Structure formats: C-alpha cells, structure tokens
Amino acid sequence: MKILNSPKEAINYTKSLNGSIGFVPTMGALHEGHLSLIEKARKENDYVIVSIFVNPTQFLPGEDLDKYPRRLEADFEICKRAGVDAVFTPTPENMYSNDEVLIKAPKIKGYILEGFNRPGHFDGVLQVVNKLFNIIRPTRAYFGKKDAQQLYLIKQMVNNFFFDIEIVECETKREKDGLALSSRNIYLSEEERKRALSISKALKRAAKLSSKTKNIEEIEKEMLEILDVDELQYIAFVDRDFNHIDEIKPGNTIILLAAKVGSTRLIDNIWI
C-alpha cells in the first residue's frame, strides 16, 4: 500500500494507473462505516484510494478541529487489511494557498439545515472535495447517506463542474443497537450514548408511521416524545432534492435530525 503525502505525489500515482479508481474521502478515525465504503469500492474498481485529511475549512470557530480524533497509523492498518492500494494524506499547507479561488455552496440549499447551523461548513466541504476530485480523478467516489445534505450538494457540484465521476450512495452503517456510526461517537459518555439511541429510535418510528399516515405534524409529534437529547437543532422533512415537503412522499422523502447529546453534536436521517 502506497502512502501519498502531497498532491503532486497523488497526481503522479493516479496518472500511472491503468484501470478504474474507486475513491473514499475521509477525515480519518476510520470505523466500520468507512470500511463498508472501502469494501464496496474494492468490489467495483481496479484500484482503491482513500484520503485522510482533517479539513480545517469545514470547521467553524469553536468546533472540534483541534480535538477531532487522529490516529493515522491505526487507519493505515485498517486500509491495508481492506486491500486499499494507496492512502492520500495531505496537509493543510500543501492543500491550500494564501490566495484561494473559493468555491461557495449554493445560496439556498447550502445554507439550510446543516448549512444554517454550521454556516460556511459546506463551502469548506465542497472546496476540499473539488480539490480531491481534481487530484485523484476517480472513476467512482463513495459517500455515506448519513451525511445526506453533503451527498446532495456534492452530486450537484459534480454536475455543475462537469466532473466525469460516478457518485455512489452508500447505506448508513449502524451499531447493533441502531446508533449511526460516527467518529464523534467516542466523545459520548456511557449515559450519553444510551440517550443518543433515542435519535435512531425516533427516526425508525417515523418510518414505521409513514406507512400509515402522510401527516408530518403527527409523525414529528411522536418523534419528539421519543427523543431524549439536550438540544434539538432540527427535525426536517425534505425530498431527495432537498426541497421542504408538506406531507410524506413515499420513495422521495428524507427525514433528517440534528441534536446535541451532552456537548456532542450528532446527525442522522432515514430515507423513506
């Protein structure tokens, strides 16, 4: 397995390959969710490249940039065992210049929900993903459905910038008890983790109710009765194009939820 430390190294490496490239961009602290993306990429491509980069431009002031879990050697071992061909580990210094050409998230759909609660977050996400796509030039790139709004915006960017890349949507990976896997779960105390389960339980209940009623107010009311969080930031009902909807549309509805349990911010969703 090759370790690529700079954009130039990565560009030269990918130019030398003859075959399809599956790309899994990550911020490290790899877990089973990341592994499921890597495994899917491994099955569908001749080569698999994983990037590990804690991207500073997608963190807001006061967020967890400094304490975000970093365990590079353990991540390398996970990648090696999973059959990854190369890991790209750039630094902020070789990814960004002092005079950046900035990419901005769409004015409406980039600034609702996650974009409203974390203003500027998606500017940073799209900026770095655009750079990574230009460096790696993958055939396919793999993203989890847990970050549904991010997934939607990346697909829009791919269309807008005419990238010849297939974006592969991957199901959210969960613990046996239903908690959506996240690198930030390590921040949760035992008591907080138990309460965090109320998020997936509320979403599961919403999905079950949606087969009986299309009434969003009724579904949201039941979700609120289940939730046991310290700060509910939003419950939202949207279609696959992130337009707000007035009633459940079977096959074209995503229910999204963001909340803090203790000081840890968690997001989850369910596609109906």
Curated annotation (Swiss-Prot):
<feature type="binding site">
    <location>
        <position position="150"/>
    </location>
    <ligand>
        <name>(R)-pantoate</name>
    </ligand>
</feature>
<dbReference type="GO" id="GO:0004592">
    <property type="term" value="F:pantoate-beta-alanine ligase activity"/>
</dbReference>
<comment type="similarity">
    <text>Belongs to the pantothenate synthetase family.</text>
</comment>
<feature type="binding site">
    <location>
        <position position="58"/>
    </location>
    <ligand>
        <name>(R)-pantoate</name>
    </ligand>
</feature>
<feature type="binding site">
    <location>
        <begin position="144"/>
        <end position="147"/>
    </location>
    <ligand>
        <name>ATP</name>
    </ligand>
</feature>
<feature type="binding site">
    <location>
        <begin position="181"/>
        <end position="184"/>
    </location>
    <ligand>
        <name>ATP</name>
    </ligand>
</feature>
<dbReference type="InterPro" id="IPR014729">
    <property type="entry name" value="Rossmann-like_a/b/a_fold"/>
</dbReference>
<keyword id="KW-0963">Cytoplasm</keyword>
<keyword id="KW-0566">Pantothenate biosynthesis</keyword>
<protein>
    <recommendedName>
        <fullName>Pantothenate synthetase</fullName>
        <ecNumber>6.3.2.1</ecNumber>
    </recommendedName>
</protein>
<dbReference type="InterPro" id="IPR004821">
    <property type="entry name" value="Cyt_trans-like"/>
</dbReference>
<dbReference type="InterPro" id="IPR003721">
    <property type="entry name" value="Pantoate_ligase"/>
</dbReference>
<feature type="binding site">
    <location>
        <position position="58"/>
    </location>
    <ligand>
        <name>beta-alanine</name>
    </ligand>
</feature>
<dbReference type="GO" id="GO:0005524">
    <property type="term" value="F:ATP binding"/>
</dbReference>
<dbReference type="InterPro" id="IPR042176">
    <property type="entry name" value="Pantoate_ligase_C"/>
</dbReference>
<comment type="function">
    <text>Catalyzes the condensation of pantoate with beta-alanine in an ATP-dependent reaction via a pantoyl-adenylate intermediate.</text>
</comment>
<dbReference type="Pfam" id="PF02569">
    <property type="entry name" value="Pantoate_ligase"/>
</dbReference>
<comment type="pathway">
    <text>Cofactor biosynthesis; (R)-pantothenate biosynthesis; (R)-pantothenate from (R)-pantoate and beta-alanine: step 1/1.</text>
</comment>
<keyword id="KW-0067">ATP-binding</keyword>
<dbReference type="GO" id="GO:0015940">
    <property type="term" value="P:pantothenate biosynthetic process"/>
</dbReference>
<feature type="binding site">
    <location>
        <begin position="27"/>
        <end position="34"/>
    </location>
    <ligand>
        <name>ATP</name>
    </ligand>
</feature>
<keyword id="KW-0436">Ligase</keyword>
<keyword id="KW-0547">Nucleotide-binding</keyword>
<dbReference type="GO" id="GO:0005829">
    <property type="term" value="C:cytosol"/>
</dbReference>
<feature type="active site" description="Proton donor">
    <location>
        <position position="34"/>
    </location>
</feature>
<comment type="subunit">
    <text>Homodimer.</text>
</comment>
